[in-house]
């Protein structure tokens, strides 16, 4: 009744820089990001993770996960709002996430049954993540790193999984993570009085926090299959 496996997919962010597309993990114009090694190319923002799942019954299971992802955005992208394109900010950041949550299967999913099993599912819980503190030096459009911080997020996952073989489960899922910070993109830096004049002030909306989204596949191996 236990599973261990991996998550592989793309990532994107929703906040105060660049487009506001909710799910867009795969292609990004990184020509303006000084932090990228491949200047002028299309960049894929990825997410990789490890999963452990404990199945209590055919409907309910607990999940522990560790995910690493890179995120970024650019005001100059064509799908950005006009005022953002004129502002011209861009950034790149990383996220290291530890999460615990509950999966609910909409259809009975018996991991001990040798027949093919499949079901849509949802998941939610709580995650602790670390990320880089960013800020924008006056006259420079790309954000720079100046530290790190920890924060929490609430994941909301929808997915579909299938057990085509006795010991393996394949899943396809999208997880939107609502954070408790508005600073994944560096739009709300906290500067001391000495260096503050060298950097831009806060910008963007203060009415909502940033989100990050993971879209991809899971592959898990079943072990300890005893009722």
Each PLM stretch: what is its role?
Residues 1-53, 212-216, 220-226:
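Short glycine/proline- and aromatic-enriched beta-strand/turn motifs that initiate or cap beta-hairpins
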Residues 28-38, 83-91, 140-146, 202-205:
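Extracellular loop and loop/strand-boundary signature of outer-membrane beta-barrel proteins
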Residues 21-27, 78-86, 138-145, 187-196:
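Flexible, surface-exposed loop regions and adjacent strand-edge segments
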Residues 14, 59-62, 110, 166-170, ...:
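Repeated loop/turn-to-beta-strand initiation elements of outer-membrane beta-barrel proteins
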Residues 54, 58-137, 221-223:
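Gram-negative (and chloroplast) outer-membrane scaffold detector with strong preference
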Residues 163-227:
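Predominantly the C-terminal beta-signal and adjacent terminal strand-loop region
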Residues 42-46, 94-98, 116-118, 146-154, ...:
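Residues that define the transmembrane beta-barrel architecture of outer-membrane proteins
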